[in-house]
């Protein structure tokens, strides 16, 4: 049955087991599809996360903030408060376009394959052919002779786009001979304390132990008309 047509049946079951505290109707705003105008259905799905605390990413990011110059100074407080309270970073998305999340998962226990040789092989293929190779190549090409593709599920998730943007310091500053890492300044609007400044800080603090910038300048906005 449709999820919205079984509400009362679910309530009856809860009541039957003595688990229903109250039943009534509330008028409130609710997200609807911009296409069909139908109410959205929320569904929990398995995702991939980067822990903020298991390997001290939060603390590394906070120390990076303290070592960064902010213009104006209140930008430091804004970004710091976000890092202090943010949850683990969900880096997977279910889309038909984007950069694939290159993970193989053991079928027998659901654990990801952790093998630096496989990771390097995937990275080499990505660099030569682009990330679409993940979707077009046979899994055995990435796994090599050591593993059987029959033992793994190949993920079809993509990496969330803010991880993409947060990685630009690596493939721009570290790849071009006319540029140096870290950047002297990142310059953007105040919305990027939650966006580019934020994701760049986490990605770089996790992989390089510091922010990818020496300073951050937050500019204002101009509205035309």
What is the meaning of each model-derived region?
Residues 1-115:
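Residue patterns forming the tRNA-binding/recognition surfaces of aminoacyl-tRNA synthetases
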Residues 6, 81-82, 86-88, 92-225:
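Conserved active-site neighborhood of enzyme catalytic/cofactor-binding cores
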